[in-house]
Amino acid sequence: MKLPRSSLVWCVLIVCLTLLIFTYLTRKSLCEIRYRDGHREVAAFMAYESGK
């Protein structure tokens, strides 16, 4: 079954928004994500500045 192009775009948008909302609710910030596994830790930071 093939979805129309607009339906596919809406599905992707809903999935992305759901992931963002879940991340925001479970983390302190959307700009920092940490993953710990045993003795290793991976951290991803997003740095941003205003253009003004």
From Swiss-Prot:
The chain crosses the membrane at residues 6-26. Keywords: Cell inner membrane, Cell membrane, Membrane, Plasmid, Toxin-antitoxin system, Transmembrane, Transmembrane helix. PROSITE patterns: HOK_GEF. It is a single-pass membrane protein. It is found in: Cell inner membrane. Belongs to the Hok/Gef family. Toxic component of a type I toxin-antitoxin (TA) system. Part of the plasmid-stabilizing activity of plasmid R1; when R1 is lost cells die rapidly. When overexpressed kills cells within 5 minutes; causes collapse of the transmembrane potential and arrest of respiration. Its toxic effect is partially neutralized by antisense RNA Sok. This is Protein Hok. It comes from Escherichia coli.
